Amino acid sequence: MKFENILNQMKYENSKELEEAKKYIALKGMVQYQRIINYCKSSSDEFPSYTKVSGFYRYDKRLRDNLYIYMATVEEFMRACIGNKFENDDSNLVKTEQFIKKQKKYKSVSFTLEQLTLGELIQLVLKNKMVFQDVYNLETLEINLNAFRVLRNRISHHNFLFAETYEECIINNNIDNTLKYNIANVKFLLPNEYRQRFSKKINECTK
């Protein structure tokens, strides 16, 4: 992959756009821009404009930034639900191997929860589903949390979201693995009071 090859795959209105493209490809990386160009080409635009490519990049970046914030809120919420339930008495907490290992050092349930990776937290949540019976649909919780974990991983690695593949999740009894469904999955894993604001912020990403 060569710098010039990426530049030559886009069309420019003027020399200023070309210089801007050179600047941002150097800052953000050739691979990232190539992914976006490939995505534009896959939608029947064989020679996308730099304006279109850079617009997609900014849209994707805003989407990733907002998803990151709200997905962190989901993680905090799940930790809080378990911590609030078992902080004073963890005798009924079904503990995973990783939780047991880390609790030996941190003692407190809440402090131990903070040390768990997302994957480890999800394992603990699924072992203690009944804590969330008034919040989530327990029948779809495992598949939806798995999809959540995969999306979180894509975002953490700063991947171009529109070109990625995702896991299936279930929204209103419909199952799909599209980015749109995975974003909706984040919404329904949030506490109720965050959902309207989340939808507003996601819709604003297009602006």
Predicted regions and their residues:
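Acidic/aromatic/glycine-rich contiguous surface patches that form carbohydrate-binding/processing clefts
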Residues: 158
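Extended intrinsically disordered or low-complexity regions, especially N/C-terminal cytosolic tails and loops
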Residues: 1-151, 162-207
